Amino acid sequence: MTREEKRIRVIQALISHQQHIANVAKQEMDSAQQQSNDYGANVDRYDSYRTKMMRARDMYAKQLSSANASLRFLDEALKMKPFDIAEHGAIVVTDKQRFFLSIGAGKFVVKDSESPTGMQYYFAISAQTPIYMAVKGKAVGDSFIINGIAQTIKEIY
């Protein structure tokens, strides 16, 4: 599998993960709005139940907005060529872990028939994380230490 094919496979897995998050946020936002509407007419401006539902709706709306912004970045990342240096948009494989330097989405799964388990775990990390700062600007063969653990970069794509 080429570097570009690996890259696309990882990004598509994260897109799927983010789409699921966006769908759940949309469903919860709609549910909170519906519960507020079903509660009846707004007779008291200090109605705590309605206020609670509106706060929940607003919270899920923020999550949906964030997920949609992440999806826009990931769509752009699909168009990028594989990287040689660890920078924003690169996928970095070390001797211990796999990172996608992109959005703060945490751990996600990529199906991989070559892996003994049939899947590999990646971590989508944002530019504000210590790991991102430690790996930024490094190339294949370079090492870095994070939380007292030395890691060597095996691949970047």
Positions of the model-derived regions?
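Conserved hydrophobic positions within beta-strands
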Residues: 153-157
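Non-DNA-binding regulatory cores of transcription-related proteins
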Residues: 80-145, 151
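Short coil/turn segments at secondary-structure boundaries
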Residues: 27, 147-148
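N-terminal intrinsically disordered, low-complexity, charge/repeat-rich segments that act as generic
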Residues: 1-80
